[in-house]
Amino acid sequence: MMQPDIEEWEILSAGEMHRSIQLGNGKELVSVGKLTIEEYAQTLQETYAGISLMCSPHPSYPPLEMSVFDVKTITNTYANKDLKDFNGNMVSLNNISPMNIATHLTEICKAYRPQVEHVTANPLYVKNEHVFDFIKDIKEILG
């Protein structure tokens, strides 16, 4: 089923530059290539939904960054890593078949609202005030 307002949506791919990919029904995935940090932040501020799949269990920051910018983010589980509880903007899938991703993306897009209320989700990640609290303990032990 196609999104009723699909003609209003722009579909972008950030990262490695690639040719545009025709998606059907007059829509294409447009590559914007690698973005500066400022361009990346601006793009996230203007984005409602995104897909960022992990290909290793190592830290994968794009889905985290997208979700704290209030982007409804689809990602995947990988081995023992599951971001589903990171915040309410994260959708973490065990099954990343194209049909399953499309189904979840359609659900997200059907819930689209022009104004997305900002909620400071996962403030420990966002504010990052006490990252190295353990250093004082190490100093005391070694002291």
Predicted regions: what they are:
Residues 1-26:
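Conserved catalytic-core segment of nucleotide-activated headgroup transferases in glycan assembly
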Residues 26-36:
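Active-site donor-binding acidic/aromatic loop of nucleotide-activated sugar
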Residues 36-47, 68:
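Short acidic alpha-helix that forms the nucleotide-activated donor recognition element
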Residues 42-58:
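Acidic donor-binding loop of glycosyltransferase active sites
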Residues 53-63, 68, 82-84:
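Nucleotide-sugar-dependent
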Residues 71-76:
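Short hydrophobic beta-strand element within catalytic cores of glycosyltransferases
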Residues 95-96, 110-143:
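A charged, aromatic-enriched C-terminal amphipathic alpha-helix characteristic of glycosyltransferases
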